Each structure stands twice: as C-alpha cells, then as structure tokens.
Amino acid sequence: MKEMKRSRIKEPLNSTTKNIDLVKKNPETWRIIPGSIGQYTYMLDGTKLSGVFNGHGLPPDAAYDLVSYKHGNDVIVLGMGVVNARGDLRITNDPIDVGPAHEWTGDYTGQPAGYKIWLVPVANIENGKLAWHPNSFLFEKSLAR
C-alpha cells in the first residue's frame, strides 16, 4: 500500500489572537490616568493587522479612528466608528497592511519591534496625518506583535 504524504496547512505568522488595552495617558509623564478605556483584539499575519476594538466611557456621538501610529505624524487608519449613547464604541477592521514593525524607544527600549495602536478623534486625522491633541486619545499599554 502506497503511503500518503500529509500536507500541512501553513499557518500565518503570529496567527494567534492577542489583546492590547488602550488607556488615557498623561502626555507629560505617559502615566496611565483614569478615564475612557478600550481593548483591541487582533491578529497579525506578517504585516497585515486585523481585529476588533471595543471602547467604553467615551463621549456619546463622537467619531473615532483606530490607527496604527507610524512615526512623526503619520498613521494608518484601521477603522472608524461612532460612539453610542452609552459611551461604547466598536470598530472592526479587515486585514490592512501596516508595513514593517518599528523599534520604539522610551518605555519600549530594548523590546522587539511592534506597532502602536491608538484611538483618536476623526477630526485629528487628515490625509493620513495626525494632529497632536493627546488629551483626547487612547494609547496602547503594549505593542502589537
């Protein structure tokens, strides 16, 4: 009897689902402060990022972009949503190429490269450029990898 070879399905790199908490931070100290919160549940397949963001305690009817912050004032918009009357927000994004991971300094010095994920008001983004108003942003607690 002829032995059959088993074919293996190639799994995407980093194909497991992971979570990143997004929080308010003091822009002078970068310490976490009380306020709105969120969580991004994501998958990273090479440089393609997909996932679901759920936020709470946000201003009702406010429009937000979920972004991958690159450098300077460059961002890639992952998705957009409007906060409901209870202050909750859900944004889902299909796989988007976010380019190569970046090696960050500050809190991330010496750590493997990754992606910063932020929630920012839609009014703060124009043509992929970010207007810096950090008091209205939610910032990542850890990098997407």
Regions from the PLM with identified roles:
Residues 1-145:
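N-terminal targeting/export leaders
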